Amino acid sequence: MKTFSAKPHEVKRDWYVIDATDKVLGRVASEVARRLRGKHKPEFTPHVDTGDYIIIVNAAKLRVTGTKETDKKYYRHSGYPGGIYETTFGKMQQRFPGRALEKAVKGMLPKGPLGYAMIKKLKVYAEAEHPHEAQQPKALEI
């Protein structure tokens, strides 16, 4: 018996919506990364993008445990000498709700062309509304 290998044109992708209200950042991110990659499917193939589309609503109401609200730091660099910027989780959630979740999920996906294709299937919205009703997403509880 041969091992099954999924073909890119044969992959069936579903749409799921997750309500992130009062959910912990890391727990949501790890499950989302798993589903974007397609590891929950029996036809998972490492070199083919078999994952589903994930819509996350209420990302502004995401939480972290302990003192990570003030202690967790995010860094970015402008490219110029001395151009490093630092911000906390709390400030990032106020200014860009959902970006912390996007960064967490992106860090859990493979690096390279396949990982970049996977992260494009993640849609994050700060509020409860999203423009993907036409895709009829199923509710996913984490």
Swiss-Prot record:
One example of the protein's molecular function in GO is: structural constituent of ribosome
The entry's keywords: Ribonucleoprotein, Ribosomal protein
Give one Pfam family, short name only. Answer: Ribosomal_L13
Any one GO CC term of this protein is: cytosolic large ribosomal subunit
| GO biological process per UniProt | negative regulation of translation; translation
Q: Where is the signal peptide?
A: none
Q: List the disulfide bonds.
A: none
Q: Which family does it belong to?
A: Belongs to the universal ribosomal protein uL13 family.
Description of how the protein assembles with itself and partners: Part of the 50S ribosomal subunit.
What is the role of the protein in this entry? This protein is one of the early assembly proteins of the 50S ribosomal subunit, although it is not seen to bind rRNA by itself. It is important during the early stages of 50S assembly.
Q: Which HAMAP family match?
A: Ribosomal_uL13
Protein's UniProt name: Large ribosomal subunit protein uL13
